[in-house]
Amino acid sequence: MALSMPLNGLKEEDKEPIIELFVKAGSDGESIGNCPFSQRLFMILWLKGVVFSVTTVDLKRKPADLQNLAPGTHPPFITFNNEVKTDVNKIEEFLEEVLCPPKYLKLSPKHPESNTAGMDIFAKFSAYIKNSRPEANEALERGLLKTLQKLDEYLNSPLPDEIDENSMEDIKFSTRKFLDGNEMTLADCNLLPKLHIVKVVAKKYRNFDIPKGMTGIWRYLTNAYSRDEFTNTCPSDKEVEIAYSDVAKRLTK
């Protein structure tokens, strides 16, 4: 009978995987660049509590060794025990499946609605920011506001586990910190990087602020900005503005 001997006293399943994350570099070629998909994977790995390394990739001069590693691939991608994985959605599924309890946190939301909350915002924002026709601006801004309002309503609506059926108190507003509760989930890793871009870019190029009356969104963003998993994986506001300097169209008659 063949026995699989543990290496260095560790069983195979107890060994830490070797993970390297490759993300888009900023304008200086070294710092974290503007890429919500890069930040999404960065946040997932950080929240999982797994040991991993991060390499920023300067797209202007992609190193030869990187082209050999993942030819024709733009970041983000990962290597997991030297195996290259390039599809962001599949990487998310893979990490959730492989880095699982009890050793690692489960990050899937409990409530399916959390996965789709805010999903239309980025498309409406893109149409708004790329438009150059003044006569179309108001309607596009209304479209963006409508999707933000929908997210705000979701964040302010109590989740089932916030409502105590035995309590006499009628809870009308949620006080949760994130989409699915008081802890970040995969849904937040997807939405927060995009929502931050909307906030920064719309202010810079359209002087548009997310209305202060949208208390759910502002509570959500404030809680995100207090977490290292978000702020330390986030590009600087300047990087976000630079990334959109050619994308954001001036309103010209």
Curated annotation (Swiss-Prot):
Residues 81-244 form the GST C-terminal domain. Keywords: Acetylation, Cell junction, Cell membrane, Chloride, Chloride channel, Cytoplasm, Cytoplasmic vesicle, Cytoskeleton, Ion channel, Ion transport, Membrane, Mitochondrion, Nucleus, Oxidoreductase, Phosphoprotein, Transmembrane, Transmembrane helix, Transport, Voltage-gated channel. Coiled coil: none annotated. A motif (G-site) lies at residues 35-38. SUPFAM superfamilies: GST C-terminal domain-like (SSF47616), Thioredoxin-like (SSF52833). The active G-site contains a monothiol Cys-X-X-Ser motif which mediates glutathione-dependent redox catalysis. Members of this family may change from a globular, soluble state to a state where the N-terminal domain is inserted into the membrane and functions as a chloride channel. The redox status of the active cysteine in Cys-X-X-Cys/Ser motif likely determines the capacity to adopt a soluble or membrane-inserted state. A conformation change of the N-terminal domain is thought to expose hydrophobic surfaces that trigger membrane insertion. In the soluble state, catalyzes glutaredoxin-like thiol disulfide exchange reactions with reduced glutathione as electron donor. Can insert into membranes and form voltage-dependent multi-ion conductive channels. Membrane insertion seems to be redox-regulated and may occur only under oxidizing conditions. Has alternate cellular functions like a potential role in angiogenesis or in maintaining apical-basolateral membrane polarity during mitosis and cytokinesis. Could also promote endothelial cell proliferation and regulate endothelial morphogenesis (tubulogenesis). It is a single-pass membrane protein. It comes from the Eukaryota. The gene is CLIC4. One of its GO terms (cellular component) is chloride channel complex. The modification N-acetylalanine is found at residue 2. One of its GO terms (biological process) is angiogenesis. Pfam families: CLIC-like_N (PF22441), GST_C_2 (PF13410). The modification Phosphoserine is found at residues 4, 132, 167, 236. The modification Phosphotyrosine is found at residue 244. Its EC number is 1.8.-.-. One of its GO terms (molecular function) is oxidoreductase activity. Gene3D superfamilies: 1.20.1050.10, Glutaredoxin. It is found in: Cytoplasm, Cytoskeleton, Microtubule organizing center, Centrosome; Cytoplasmic vesicle membrane; Nucleus; Cell membrane. The keyword ATP-binding does not apply. The chain crosses the membrane at residues 37-57. Belongs to the chloride channel CLIC family. This is Chloride intracellular channel protein 4. Residues 2-101 are annotated as: Required for insertion into the membrane. The modification N6-acetyllysine is found at residues 24, 130.
